[in-house]
Amino acid sequence: MSNDFLFTSESVSEGHPDKVADQISDAVLDAILAQDKYARVAAETLCNTGLVVLAGEITTTANVDYIQVARETIKRIGYDNTEYGIDYKGCAVLVAYDKQSPDIAQGVDRASDDYLNQGAGDQGLMFGYACDETPELMPFPIYYSHRLVERQSLLRRDGRLPWLRPDAKSQVTVRYVDGRPHSVDTVVLSTQHAPDISQAQIREAVIEEIIKPVLPAEMLKETKYLVNPTGRFVIGGPQGDCGLTGRKIIVDTYGGASPHGGGAFSGKDPSKVDRSAAYAARYVAKNVVAAGLARQCQVQVSYAIGVARPINVTVYTEGTGKISDEKIAALVQEHFDLRPKGIVQMLDLLRPIYEKTAAYGHFGREEPEFSWEATDKAAILRAAAGL
C-alpha cells in the first residue's frame, strides 16, 4: 500500500441485530461467571422478529434464568416496543444449551505439554494490534466509527433526539497522507428512526448533533456526509435482519486495519483462546507501542487444542520499530505469559465483565474492567529494549 490512500472502517450500534445477539450471549456468560468462574461457556444467540434462540454448550454449577437474562438485555438496549423490531416483554425465547464435549474438556482441563497449566480450548490463530493514530492507540477509522454510534445511542437515551431508534450503523473513510490520517473523506451514518420525521430533519440533526461533535474539526475539510442514504430506516433491529452472535468480528477488533484470525469473542469463556488470546495480543501490542518500541505493532499468536504454550508469537511493526521485530518478539515472550492460564491470571479474566465489551468495540476503550487496555508493561519493555 502506498503512503497516500483512503481507508474505511465501520461500526454498528448496540441495537444492531448482530450486536443484540452478541450482548445476549455475553450477558449469559456474565450471569454464569458471577456464580461459577470456572464454567465452560459457548453461548450462541439468534434473534429475529419476535424470537430469540439460545443455543451452544455450557458446563456449569450456576443456576441461571437464561430467558430472563435475554429479556433484560433486550430491554436495556431499548427494544421495549414491537414497533422498534422486537419487544422484550412479548418475544419468545427458546433455550437449547448442551454441555461441553468431554473430548474437548479433557484437553482443556489438562494440557498435554504442561500438566500445571490449562490447555487451549481450540486450535487457532489470533491477532492483536496497536498504533499511534489516536491516544487510545487504535486506528483512527474504527475508533471514530465506534464513537459515532455510541453518540447516537447517547442522544437516543437522554431524549435529545427522541425520534432515534436503537439500530444504527456508521462508516468512516479516512484519507492518509504519508501514512498518517490527514482528513475524513466520507462519513456514512444510518440510523433507525420514528416514521414521522423527515429526511431533511434527520440529516441536519445527525450531522450537527452526532457527527460534528465527535470527529475532530480539523479533520473535516471537504468531508462528504451520507445520512440514511436509502431515504428511510423505520424497520430495523431483529425485524429488519436476523441477528447472530459472532458476525461483527471486524467491528469488534480493528476495522480491517489488522488481520483477523476468524474466531468471534462473545459468549465464550476465557478458556477459549479465540477471545482470551486476542485480548492478550492487544495488551502486548498496545504496550509495545506505548513503550515507544514502534509506531505500529501487530502480534500473531497461535495455539493447538489441549496444548498450553503458543505455537508461535510473531511481531510485525511495518518498518516502524526502533529495534528489530525479532527482538521485540523475544521481549514479548520474556515479559508476557501467553499460555491460556497465564493470560487469565495476567488479565484477571474470570470476572463477569463481558457484556460491556459486546458493543462499541472490545479494544480502545478506557473502561476499568478492560485490563487488556492497560499499559503497565510499557516501562519494563522500554528499559529491556535499552531505549
Curated annotation (Swiss-Prot):
It catalyses: L-methionine + ATP + H2O = S-adenosyl-L-methionine + phosphate + diphosphate. GO terms for molecular function: ATP binding; magnesium ion binding; methionine adenosyltransferase activity. Its cofactor is Mg(2+); K(+). Keywords: ATP-binding, Cytoplasm, Magnesium, Metal-binding, Nucleotide-binding, One-carbon metabolism, Potassium, Transferase. Residues 100-110 are annotated as: Flexible loop. Mg(2+) binds at residue 18. InterPro entries: ADOMET_SYNTHASE_CS, S-AdoMet_synt_C, S-AdoMet_synt_central, S-AdoMet_synt_N, S-AdoMet_synthetase, S-AdoMet_synthetase_sfam. GO terms for cellular component: cytoplasm. The keyword Metal-binding applies. This is S-adenosylmethionine synthase. The gene is metK.
